[in-house]
Curated annotation (Swiss-Prot):
It catalyses: 2-C-methyl-D-erythritol 4-phosphate + NADP(+) = 1-deoxy-D-xylulose 5-phosphate + NADPH + H(+). It is an enzyme of class 1 (oxidoreductase). Belongs to the DXR family. The gene is dxr. Pathway: Isoprenoid biosynthesis; isopentenyl diphosphate biosynthesis via DXP pathway; isopentenyl diphosphate from 1-deoxy-D-xylulose 5-phosphate: step 1/6. InterPro entries: DXP_reductoisomerase, DXP_reductoisomerase_C, DXP_reductoisomerase_N, DXPR_C, DXPR_C_sf, NAD(P)-bd_dom_sf. This is 1-deoxy-D-xylulose 5-phosphate reductoisomerase. Catalyzes the NADPH-dependent rearrangement and reduction of 1-deoxy-D-xylulose-5-phosphate (DXP) to 2-C-methyl-D-erythritol 4-phosphate (MEP). 1-deoxy-D-xylulose 5-phosphate binds at K125, S151, E152, S176, H199, S212, N217, K218, E221.
Length: 385
C-alpha cells in the first residue's frame, strides 16, 4: 500500500489523481490533500476518501471546512496555509507526494518533501524551472525518485529506461500547438482569454491553458527536461504534433528513435508515476492503429510564439533567469486573464523582465524567492494590481 499526499487536489491533475486512487484502492491510499479555496470540492473529497489531513490556503475556506468536519464529527484534521502544506508533505507515513499546485507556491513544500525522503510525483513545472539544480541535487542526496506526471516527461522517462545517458543524441518534446497552431503574429492581435482557453486536445486549468496557447508551457517543459534528464538545451527539440498521440521521443546516437504513444489522457502518466516501477491495468481507451489515419510533425514558430524562444534563452543563461521568466509569466498570464494586457504582450513582458532583473546569481532557494518577489512587485506596481 502506498500512502499519498496530493498538493492541489481540486485542480485538473489533482482530480484525475483522485480518479486513479479511486480505481486502485487496494494499492493506493489518500492520506492528505491541499487546496487553495475550493472548499466545496474539498468537502466532497473528505466525505469520499476520509483523508487524515486537509489543508486550505484561504482563510474563509479553511474555516468552512473546519466547521464542516467538527459539525459532522469527521476525524480529518484541517490545517491552513504554507505551514499546513509543508506539514502534509513531510508526514512520516506518506510514501509519495503529488505536487499538482500551480506556480511557485509548490517549491518549498516539494523541497521539504524531498528532504523527508518522499518520492515526488511532479506535475508542478515551476518547481524544476526555478530551482531545478537544487531540487535534483537534493533528490540524489536523499535517494528520492522524481517521477514526472505530465505526459511529455513521463514519456521521455519511459523512453530512456534501460538505456545509457551517453547514448542519447536528442530528446524530442512534442507539442499539440495549442489553439493557435499555424497562426501568425498579426492574426493574434485581438485574441481574448476565452479564445486562448479553448485547448484542442487537453482539459486543463486556466493558467496552463494560456501557457499552452503561448507555447510557454512547452518552454517550461524544455527547462524541466534539461534538469530531469541532464541533457543540454541544444539537444532538446520541440516538435508540434497536433494529434497528441506521440507524447515525446528520444533519439539515440545510432539513429534509432524510441517514442511513447498513447491515447491522450492524463490519467496514464499519473498512474505510471504512482505505481512506479510497476505498470497496472489502465481504463484509458487503447490506441487503434487502424483508425489513426496520419501523424504529422511540424517545426514550432518561435517568432510568433515568443515565450518558447525566451524559455530556451532563460534556460541557457541559467542561474536565476528561469525564475525571472517564470515569475513574469505567472503575473502576465493573470493580467491577460483579467483583461489588463493583450495576448501578445505576455511575451513582451517576459522579455522586459528578463532584461531588467537578470543578475549573475546561483539559483539557491533564497535567491530564486527573492528575484521572484522583485519581478512580481515590479509588475504589480506597473499594472496597479
Amino acid at each position: 500500500m502506498k500512502n499519498i499526499t496530493i498538493l492541489g487536489a481540486t485542480g485538473s491533475i489533482g482530480t484525475q489523481t483522485l480518479d486513479v486512487i479511486r480505481r486502485e484502492k487496494e494499492e493506493l491510499k489518500l492520506v492528505a490533500i491541499s487546496a487553495n479555496k475550493s472548499y466545496k470540492k474539498v468537502i466532497e473529497i473528505i466525505k469520499e476518501f476520509k483523508p487524515k489531513y486537509a489543508v486550505l490556503m484561504e482563510e474563509n475556506a479553511f474555516k468552512i471546512v473546519e466547521d464542516f468536519c467538527i459539525d459532522n464529527k469527521i476525524d480529518t484534521k484541517v490545517l491552513k496555509g504554507m505551514e499546513g502544506m509543508i506539514y502534509i508533505s513531510t508526514l512520516e507515513e506518506v510514501n509519495t507526494v503529488v505536487t499538482s499546485v500551480v506556480g511557485m507556491i509548490g517549491l518549498v513544500p516539494t523541497i521539504k518533501a524531498i528532504e523527508s525522503g518522499k518520492d515526488i510525483a511532479l506535475a508542478n513545472k515551476e518547481t524544476l524551472v526555478v530551482a531545478g539544480e537544487l531540487v535534483i541535487s537534493k533528490a540524489k542526496e536523499h535517494n528520492v525518485n522524481i517521477l514526472p506526471v505530465d505526459s511529455e516527461h513521463g514519456a521521455i522517462f519511459q523512453c530512456l529506461r534501460g538505456n545509457k545517458k551517453e547514448e542519447v543524441k536528442n530528446i524530442i518534446v512534442t507539442a499539440s500547438g495549442g489553439p493557435f497552431r499555424g497562426k501568425k503574429k498579426e492574426e493574434l492581435i485581438d485574441v481574448k482569454p476565452e479564445h486562448a482557453l479553448k485547448h484542442p486536445k487537453w482539459n486543463m486549468g486556466r493558467k496552463i491553458s494560456i501557457d499552452s496557447a503561448t507555447l510557454m508551457n512547452k518552454g517550461l517543459e524544455v527547462i524541466e527536461a534539461h534538469f530531469l534528464f541532464g541533457v543540454d538545451y541544444e539537444n532538446i527539440k520541440v516538435v508540434v504534433h497536433p494529434q497528441s498521440i506521440v507524447h515525446s521521443m528520444v533519439e539515440y546516437k545510432d539513429g534509432s528513435v524510441i517514442a511513447q504513444m498513447a491515447t491522450p489522457d492524463m490519467k496514464l502518466p499519473i498512474q505510471y508515476a504512482l505505481n512506479y516501477p510497476n505498470r497496472k491495468e489502465s481504463q484509458i481507451e487503447p490506441l487503434d492503429f487502424y483508425k489513426i489515419s496520419n501523424l504529422t510533425f511540424e517545426k514550432p514558430d518561435m517568432d510568433t510564439f515568443l515565450p518558447l524562444k525566451l524559455a530556451y534563452e532563460a534556460g541557457k543563461k541559467g542561474g536565476v533567469m528561469p525564475a525571472i521568466l517564470n515569475g513574469a509569466n505567472e503575473v502576465a498570464v493573470d493580467l491577460f486573464l483579467k483583461g489588463k494586457i493583450e495576448f501578445l504582450q505576455i511575451g513582451d513582458l517576459l522579455q522586459e523582465c528578463m532584461n531588467k532583473f537578470y543578475k549573475s546569481m546561483e539559483a539557491t532557494l533564497e535567491n530564486v524567492i527573492s528575484v521572484d518577489k522583485e519581478v512580481r512587485e515590479y509588475l504589480g506596481k506597473k499594472y496597479d494590481i
